Amino acid sequence: MISPQRRAEVIEALRRGTVPKAGLDALAVGYGRLQGTLDEELEAVAAGRGAFKAIRGEYGSGKTFFGRWLQERARARGLATSEVQISETETPLHRLETVYRRLVERIATADSGEGAFRGIVDGWFYALERDVLEDTNLDPTDEATLLAKTEALMEARLASVTKVAPAFSATLRAYRRALQANDNATADGLQPI
């Protein structure tokens, strides 16, 4: 059963002639033969393998609907998704830095809509601290030691990233330092996009 709020959101989007952002499972028909294969691919992604899908078709053929339906299924499995529509003026395919920026700006998770990248990075920093506390007999109130051990773990985990994307690693380090110093202006300016 669809809640009244969800029903109103879907109907309002359809009135505007747009694809609803959520609740597409209630409208999806004809995807039965694709569903098993796509679910297998989502499970493979959840297990650590990557996947990329591009959808191409004529105007009105259901590309956006299908993409958003698949994104809903992915987010329900705890995956992050991003949707970018390639266009000659807004996001041209030959401008990869623009495509990348749009992908990162529009990352969404089940817990937060578009713009979830900062939360993902902050969650990674939290996971580092949690891992340090679980692996050692560290006193959680010893902030200096916690910070030092977390920095060491971060460097170990960023080692392979630094080889292929040194600017990204440097931005993560600077962003974390700004957060630790409560320098929100610098942290906001360094969001690793």
Give the role of each language-model region:
Residues 58:
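P-loop (Walker A) phosphate-binding loop of NTP-binding proteins
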Residues 61, 65-193:
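P-loop NTPase nucleotide-binding core
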Residues 1-51:
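A short, basic N-terminal segment
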Residues 55:
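Hydrophobic anchor at the beta1->P-loop junction of P-loop NTPases
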